[in-house]
């Protein structure tokens, strides 16, 4: 379980970092079309949504009385359905400002490192009690890491579409 999860973490963040590196410093802060976030804002949203996991995993947990990965397929079906538009909750909406590509890259590397360490050092079957995604019961550590992955994959896809749009302007 841990080896496969760690491979998924590395692959997800490699694709995300490769996509981010394809943007110039100027393109990072370019609004591709009306109503869209800039690539920098998309990455900042990923950072906001995928930060704080070590603290969550260190918080209150309990033994899980269901399958530890019960919600993974549902999360995949929601987040990897690219035909569905979602609205971020206010606390995950990125500020409209100029973002620095290097700072974003460093923040993503820290998140990748945090997730890899968590996947190695924690009992992934424990249920976290300190935070809950609306509409779901409390997630296990395994499900939280998968949430971070499908969230990142969704927005990597969004960044690839923005890149295509910007380069064809």
Language-model features, listed with the residues they occupy:
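Long, hydrophobic N-terminal alpha-helical segment
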Residues: 1, 9-46
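Soluble, non-transmembrane catalytic domains of enzymes that act on hydrophobic metabolites at membranes
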Residues: 6, 11, 16, 48, ...
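Short, contiguous alpha-helical
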Residues: 29-79, 121-169
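Acidic/histidine-rich alpha-helical segments that form the ligand environment
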Residues: 75-126
